[in-house]
């Protein structure tokens, strides 16, 4: 416990809250280039091959981003738009790629929740 004199000299400092999406540098989304597109397996109770891309953002940081939806057209050097949002069963994946923006196509034959997957109404 500091003395009153120590508080007069130094004061108290607020703790800064840690940001979950630091690589976006305060932006809602960030553009990036895929450096690697691959599949990975989820944590213990689940079993699948989750589609993930390694993306170099315009902020200069390289992050792992999840590719949501069934099927995708991404490959190395594809331009993608990345938003925040982690994938609970993939450790270290804290970003998602926005479907239907830049080089990423929307999900084909999607009928419900279309806006999340960049699917047109037709």
Swiss-Prot record:
The keyword RNA-binding applies. Keywords: Ribonucleoprotein, Ribosomal protein, RNA-binding, rRNA-binding, tRNA-binding. Signal peptide: none annotated. InterPro entries: NA-bd_OB-fold, Ribosomal_uS12, Ribosomal_uS12_bac. It comes from the Bacteria. GO terms for molecular function: rRNA binding; structural constituent of ribosome; tRNA binding. Transmembrane segments: none annotated. One of its GO terms (cellular component) is small ribosomal subunit. GO terms for biological process: translation. The keyword tRNA-binding applies. Pfam families: Ribosom_S12_S23. Part of the 30S ribosomal subunit. Contacts proteins S8 and S17. May interact with IF1 in the 30S initiation complex. PANTHER family: 30S RIBOSOMAL PROTEIN S12 FAMILY MEMBER. NCBIfam families: rpsL_bact. Belongs to the universal ribosomal protein uS12 family. With S4 and S5 plays an important role in translational accuracy. Interacts with and stabilizes bases of the 16S rRNA that are involved in tRNA selection in the A site and with the mRNA backbone. Located at the interface of the 30S and 50S subunits, it traverses the body of the 30S subunit contacting proteins on the other side and probably holding the rRNA structure together. The combined cluster of proteins S8, S12 and S17 appears to hold together the shoulder and platform of the 30S subunit. This is Small ribosomal subunit protein uS12. It comes from Corynebacterium efficiens (strain DSM 44549 / YS-314 / AJ 12310 / JCM 11189 / NBRC 100395).
């Amino acid at each position: 416990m500091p003395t009153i004199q120590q508080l007069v000299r130094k004061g108290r400092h607020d703790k800064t809250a840690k940001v979950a999406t630091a690589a976006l540098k305060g932006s809602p989304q960030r553009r990036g280039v895929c450096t690697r597109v691959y599949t990975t397996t989820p944590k213990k109770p689940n079993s699948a091959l989750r589609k993930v891309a390694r993306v170099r953002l315009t902020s200069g940081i390289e992050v792992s981003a999840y590719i949501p939806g069934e099927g995708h057209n991404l490959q190395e050097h594809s331009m993608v738009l990345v938003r925040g949002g982690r994938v609970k069963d993939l450790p270290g994946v804290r970003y998602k790629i926005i479907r239907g923006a830049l080089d990423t196509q929307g999900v084909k034959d999607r009928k419900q929740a279309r806006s999340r997957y960049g699917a047109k109404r037709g």
